[in-house]
Regions:
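Solvent-exposed functional surfaces
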Residues: 1-169, 174
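Acidic, carboxylate-rich catalytic segments that either coordinate divalent cations
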Residues: 166-201
Length: 201
């Protein structure tokens, strides 16, 4: 039986001499490992891994979150610093601290099936929300992310209600699936709503 992908990616941080296509995944796997196991992390014990089966967040979705930022976002801009890894961890830790404050009832104690916030589609789309707040506002702090996410909150339907994706696309809170199409739609919706709110300030 082949090794499960999630286990391969979990082992990547300990493997050297990898081909280029694996290196961004290796970096993401390391960041996620640290966030999952550092006691003061806002994601401590939250990510489901072979070494942490009690976690509920998708390891793959969280790696995608990091990779989006590393490929063309905040983390990419940190690469010029010697402590870029520490900056990357701090950024994501601060963002998810804010997520847990602003969306407390949609996060605490819930599984992905009960909250799209903790679902693969929600997590990956949130990476673009973080990037928008960073690129538009220079946000890296917990307080800055809390302020930005509060603007977005009225437009979300993580656990109940409907997503008003467009005039012709309205779907129940759990009608968003973990597919590239739905992730793209949710990302576009969240970032457009946030841009509108930021302009009003």
């Amino acid at each position: 039986r082949p090794l499960p992908k999630s286990l391969i990616y979990e082992l990547l941080p300990t493997v050297d001499g990898l081909p280029e296509r694996f290196t961004s995944r290796k970096f993401a796997a390391r960041i996620i490992d640290l966030l999952n196991f550092l006691p003061n992390s806002s994601l401590f014990g939250e990510i489901k891994q072979h070494t942490n089966p009690r976690g509920v967040l998708s390891d793959m979705a969280m790696q995608k979150f990091v990779m989006n930022s590393a490929n063309d976002g905040a983390i990419r801009s940190f690469m010029k610093f010697d402590d870029f890894e520490g900056r990357s961890i701090e950024l994501i830790n601060n963002f998810f601290h804010a997520v847990r404050v602003v969306f407390k009832s949609e996060w605490e104690g819930l599984a992905p099936r009960n909250s799209r916030l903790k679902h693969g589609a929600g997590l990956v789309s949130l990476s673009f929300v973080m990037e928008l707040l960073y690129s538009d506002q220079g946000t890296t702090s917990k307080e800055g992310f809390i302020k930005g996410l509060k603007l977005l909150k009225p437009h979300t339907a993580w656990t109940s209600g409907d997503w008003h994706i467009s005039e012709t696309d309205r779907r129940p809170w759990n009608g968003i699936q973990n597919t590239p199409t739905d992730i793209g739609l949710l990302t576009k919706y969240l970032t457009e709503k946030l841009k509108q709110e930021l302009k009003r300030r």
